[in-house]
Curated annotation (Swiss-Prot):
Pfam families with a match to the protein in the record: CsrA
Keyword Repressor in record: yes
Single GO MF annotation: mRNA 5'-UTR binding
Protein's UniProt name: Translational regulator CsrA
Organism from which the protein derives: Acinetobacter baumannii (strain ATCC 17978 / DSM 105126 / CIP 53.77 / LMG 1025 / NCDC KC755 / 5377)
Family classification: Belongs to the CsrA/RsmA family.
GO cellular component, one term: cytosol
Assembly: Homodimer; the beta-strands of each monomer intercalate to form a hydrophobic core, while the alpha-helices form wings that extend away from the core.
Subcellular location: Cytoplasm
Keywords assigned by UniProt, alphabetized: Activator, Cytoplasm, Repressor, RNA-binding, Translation regulation
NCBIfam families on file: csrA, PRK01712.1
Database matches in SUPFAM superfamilies: CsrA-like
Domain of life: Bacteria
Length: 84
């Protein structure tokens, strides 16, 4: 991890397109501003983790739904062809 010291009003660059500026310090809180292109997502860590969790759950549910569809189609096939 790179550790930097910045004062209020000072900026650091991440690559060529992302800048992070220290806007203020009050007690143990630091306000920062992030300038980034629209295609770059910027989230607080706890929000990012929630998004990742929701994506994983959505993918899992889609996978379960696909498994159910295959199973349901197999059951229909079996009923049509073997229950005569």
């Amino acid at each position: 991890m790179l550790i930097l010291t910045r004062r209020v009003g000072e900026t650091l660059m991440i690559g060529d397109q992302v800048s992070v500026t220290v806007l203020g310090v009050k007690g143990n809180q630091v306000r920062i501003g992030v300038n980034a292109p629209k295609e770059v997502s910027v989230h607080r860590e706890e929000i990012y983790q929630r998004i990742q969790h929701e994506r994983a759950m959505h993918e899992h549910l889609q996978h379960l739904d696909q498994d159910y569809q295959v199973s349901y189609e197999d059951d229909n096939y079996a009923q049509k062809n073997f229950n005569r």
